[in-house]
Amino acid sequence: MRIIIFLSLLIFNSCSYQSFDKRVNLINNVNDGSFKKVIYDKGFIDIFSLQKIENRQEVQEVIVYIEGDGLSWIDRFTPSSDPTPVDPLTFKLAKLDQNPNVIYLARSCQYIRNNECRKEIWTKLQYSKPVIGLYEEILEEIAQRHSKVHLIGYSGGSVIAMHLASLDKKKVKSVRTIAGNINPNEFTKLLNLSSYQTSINLDLIDDKIKDISQTHYYGSKDKVIPKEIYSNYQDQYLNNSCVQITKVNASHTKGWQKFWKNNYNLLQNC
């Protein structure tokens, strides 16, 4: 029998469960005021964002960080009351980015209270058409204001980053993933888990972004994402100079800040 289990449960493991307010305070404490809060109202739920926009000229590029699944589950059978991350790692990485224009996008129902935020959204529907559609609209708005967009996804946010990269190849110049679940279908097969409910066709995405600069970072100590996902992806694009798979001395949640501090600007030549 397949068991429904998600990245957030694997990551959560033995971490202490903090209240919503405490988790919100964590990201506020990381922010020194250089990032301003923006709420995207694009549909049935709002999306929380923190943004540093120092140059508003249209010609400027922007770096967009997309959060992982967060705290979706407390244990295998108990959904979290909200999916706000226990550790705002993705925003910490965004803070290390010294580019003038940087946007952090939380996932659906993270860092906000909304009457439409039902548990199904972060336990079953995180990659469904209505939810993914919110990020498609956000990307469209961002692309209207910037001539070049670089996407970075952490953990489960990698799927969304890769999907968005396939939609606007004219504006999206690169996609990078960090400890990313870059193939959820293969992930569920390798671990014998229930499949995600998703509107994303990963086979089509892979073909559409094969000519976009891609770097996929995985941790040598990562116990969450099977390394076979990366080796299989690398084999698929063995002769494609646009795609780079890079091993980092990190686990799924630890070691990335040290690495990112000196490598946030690395892009694969394509």
Q: Where in this protein do the model-derived segments appear?
A:
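N-terminal cap/lid segment of alpha/beta-hydrolase-fold proteins
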Residues: 23-54
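C-terminal motif of bacterial Sec signal peptides marking the signal peptidase cleavage site
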Residues: 13-14
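C-terminal catalytic histidine-bearing segment of alpha/beta-hydrolase fold enzymes
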Residues: 235, 239-270
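Short, surface-exposed "cap/lid" segments of acyl-processing enzymes
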Residues: 46, 54-106
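Gly/Ala-rich beta-loop-alpha elbow adjacent to hydrolase catalytic centers
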Residues: 152-157, 161
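The feature captures the conserved acid-bearing segment of alpha/beta-hydrolase catalytic domains
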Residues: 180, 185-249
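Alpha/beta-hydrolase active-site loop
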Residues: 118-143
